[in-house]
Amino acid sequence: MKNPIIREVCIDSIDQAKEAERLGADRLELCSDLHLDGLTPKIDDVYEVIKTIQIPVKVMVRCRGGNFIYDDSEIFKMEKEVDLLKSMGVQEIVTGALTVSNHIDQNLTRRLVERAFPMKVTFHKAIDYTHDMLDQINILSKIKGINSILTSGGAKNAAEGADKINKIINKFGNRFKIIAAGSVTNKNLEKLSKKIKTNEFHGKKIVGDLDL
């Protein structure tokens, strides 16, 4: 029997954070600019959310939209963001980086993870843009400090990627928490939870509509 479902809600405002908690979210992922799939939030928003919200909060570290290939100035910016979040007492960040060939950027990922310690790290859906996900997750498994992977199985949503997500869980479920993402809502969560062998799911509307 699987453990109780953990519903992780991605939000980009304090009002959404409060509403998600009220609706029964188990954990939040705080971002800005969800229309760009989530960027590093404003520090004032981070402070307000971690001061106000009682459930666990992860914070996105992603300096811009678009691809996950970063130049030196962007790397410097993200390193400083990691430092600041750690100094604020954030418990976990969400980040990820790829090379121009869409492989895991091992050097940058390791740098960010080591800099983040003792914060936990979730590698985000950048993994879905890699060519051989199982091979690339095997590379991630050798980077100490990454405890979770957020994925739609390389598909446009969790339902279509369910088989690949299950393959990832079968191979790496003892190493990582695998969080299924991609159009997961309160309306399809029960069905997805029977199809995908994880108890952790992520979505904007996983506990309902947050627009007040």
Show the residue positions of the predicted features.
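Catalytic cores of alpha/beta
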Residues: 12-23, 59, 63, 69-84, ...
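Glycine-rich phosphate-binding active-site loops on the catalytic face of alpha/beta enzymes
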Residues: 26-39, 84, 88-101, 144-159, ...
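N-terminal beta1-alpha1 ligand-phosphate binding loop
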Residues: 6-19, 23-38
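Hydrophobic faces of well-ordered beta-strands that scaffold small-molecule active sites
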Residues: 5-11, 28-30, 57-61, 93-95, ...
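Histidine/lysine/aspartate-rich catalytic loop segments that bind and position anionic ligands
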Residues: 118-157
